[in-house]
Swiss-Prot record:
Cofactor: Mg(2+)
Name of the gene: Gtpbp8
Species of origin: Mus musculus
Protein name: GTP-binding protein 8
UniProt cross-references to PANTHER family, sorted A to Z: GTP-BINDING PROTEIN 8
Keywords: GTP-binding, Magnesium, Metal-binding, Nucleotide-binding
A single MF term (Gene Ontology): metal ion binding
Cysteines paired by S-S bonds: none
Binding site for GTP: 118-125, 147-151, 165-168, 227-230, 262-264
Length: 285
């Protein structure tokens, strides 16, 4: 039984995201990303490819390649294509659908789904607001008080995919959090990837470990996002990223090997994350 379970878990891990298609024609992108493309090269790398920028600060004896697990390394053209998927237009409606406290209350949808989980005050709502910055009519509420999100909130991104904002775990979490989240993660058939947010300033906490164990137990393909990278010095952030990367490499089986450092304040890493989401949901085909 254990061997079969491990085999199933590894099978889920080895599922590959759809390959990015070749740049065969000119695609339009958002004016905001067009401005990013005009940045000087060093600043452009920092905003679009923060992991690559961090890797440039590694000493030669710091373990080459440890930080640069860049399995997903799209071109600027591919990122530009993905940017347009997150831009609300008459033909690409991006909207809040509904909220639910139980899976049987959730909207029944066939399109691919991704969900975001993390402890209270990790910056989840701020990140989702940044992802939807090109959809000004979509309201993502941000509160200074941890634990503001109490339900599963469903957002539809055109005909491409649905994004689900889960309640935060830990401080002021809903009483039925475990039943709500576990049931969703185990039984939502169209769930393509779970994004687990970790505060880059604090690192992986005991509560985060519980969430990681849950993802591993359910054999879920998941991705670790490091939030608030603007809050630390370069040296401290690099130390944190190296520690978390080592944890992912040695202590997990279902976690995508590449970390995604993010700042919802400076937008660093947000464009790359949009492209990754568009890729794994098949939206770039």
């Amino acid at each position: 039984m254990a061997a079969a379970r491990l085999s199933h878990r590894m099978g889920r891990l080895l599922e590959k995201a759809p390959a990015l298609g070749p740049w065969t024609r000119v695609y339009s992108t958002s004016p905001a990303f067009a401005e990013v493309l005009r940045l000087p090269q060093k600043q452009l790398t920092k905003v679009v490819y923060p992991l690559r920028e961090l890797g440039q600060h590694l000493a030669a004896d710091s373990g080459p390649g440890l930080i640069e697990q860049r399995l997903f390394d799209p071109s600027l053209e591919d990122i530009g294509r993905a940017e347009s998927i997150f831009e609300a237009t008459a033909r690409n409606r991006i909207e809040y659908l509904s909220s639910a406290v139980r899976l049987d209350h959730a909207p029944s949808l066939q399109q691919p789904e991704v969900c975001f989980i993390g402890r209270s005050n990790v910056g989840k709502s701020s990140l989702i607001k940044a992802l939807f910055s090109l959809a000004p009519d979509v309201e993502v509420r941000i509160s200074k008080k941890p634990g503001h999100t109490k339900k599963m909130n469903f957002f539809k991104v055109g005909k491409h995919f649905t994004l689900v904002d889960m309640p935060g775990y830990g401080y002021r979490a809903p009483e039925d959090f475990v039943d709500m989240v576990e049931t969703y993660l185990k039984e939502r058939n169209n769930l393509k990837r779970t994004f687990l947010l970790v505060d880059s300033v604090v690192g992986i906490t005991k509560l985060d470990n519980i969430a990681i164990e849950m993802c591993e137990e359910f054999a879920l393909p998941y991705v670790m996002i490091l939030t608030k990278i603007d809050k630390s010095s370069k040296g401290y952030l690099l130390k944190q990223v190296l520690q978390i990367q080592k944890f992912v490499n040695t202590q997990t089986q279902g976690c995508f090997p590449q970390l995604f450092p993010i700042s919802a304040v400076t937008n660093s890493g947000v464009h790359l994350l949009k492209c990754f989401i568009a890729d794994i949901t098949g939206s770039l085909k």
